[in-house]
Amino acid sequence: MEKEKVNDEKPDPENSLDFSEHFNQLELLETHGHLIPTGTQSLWIGNSDDDEEQDEKTEEWYQLQEKKMEKDPSKLLLWAAEKNRLTTVQRLLSERATHVNTRDEDKYTPLHRAAYNGHLDVVRELIAHGADVHAVTVDGWTPLHSACKWNNARVASFLLQHDADVNAQTKGLLTPLHLAAGNRDSKDTLELLLMNRYIKPGLKNSLEETAFDIARRTGIYHYLFEIVEGCTNCSPQS
């Protein structure tokens, strides 16, 4: 997803989230401002003109973009991870594996970009070359936060298998579970997180809200929290 992407369409009431007036949208906008248009509606939901335009991109177009960035392999790796250009990612890492944890101006790594776009094969390749699953952005988001925000459950599962912290908190004290709870389409991710033996569902964000508080207000899957109801002695994560 390109950082300069802007959604000029009006939010769809059926797809947008019903946050309370006190919900901390500021952190989400500051953290993923290049991904979230006004109203916190995901750019991946619906058939926007941007989606159609990206679908029309040809292989020749992608190759041209790569050629333009060849002299800046770090920039190219970030772009390739975001665009699911697995072969390009493999080539760049074989040439210089130290670029695997390169960062953009917001401290997003290639792993963050692949995670929030759901590119599992790219995620696998990056981690195989030493990508840091604990890397944080300027606002404290880990790759797991990025995957869970957009309901990329398969990516989230893979990150957890490679020691990602299921209870990691951003600067606003948001956990991956908080972010999944705020997404109406996050059933798979919620189930994945809630069934994790190390989950701490009682953690609160900077507004003193638990993930269940957010799920009850914004989604239809708050009943899933019954999985951890009464769980006061979850195993500590070493």
From Swiss-Prot:
InterPro entries with a match to the protein in the record: Ankyrin_rpt, Ankyrin_rpt-contain_sf, Multifunctional_regulatory
GO cellular component: nucleus
SUPFAM superfamilies linked to this entry: Ankyrin repeat
Compartments, as annotated in UniProt: Nucleus
A Pfam cross-reference name: Ank
The keyword Phosphoprotein is assigned to this record: yes
Keyword set includes Lipid biosynthesis: no
Main subcellular localisation: nucleus
Modified residues (Phosphoserine): 48
Residues in ANK repeats: 77-105, 106-135, 139-168, 172-205
Domain of life: Eukaryota
Keyword annotations of the record: ANK repeat, Differentiation, Nucleus, Phosphoprotein, Repeat, Spermatogenesis
Any one of the GO BP annotations: cell differentiation
Role of this protein: May have a role in spermatogenesis where it promotes autophagy in response to serum starvation, via the NF-kappaB pathway.
Protein name: Ankyrin repeat domain-containing protein 49
Organism: Bos taurus
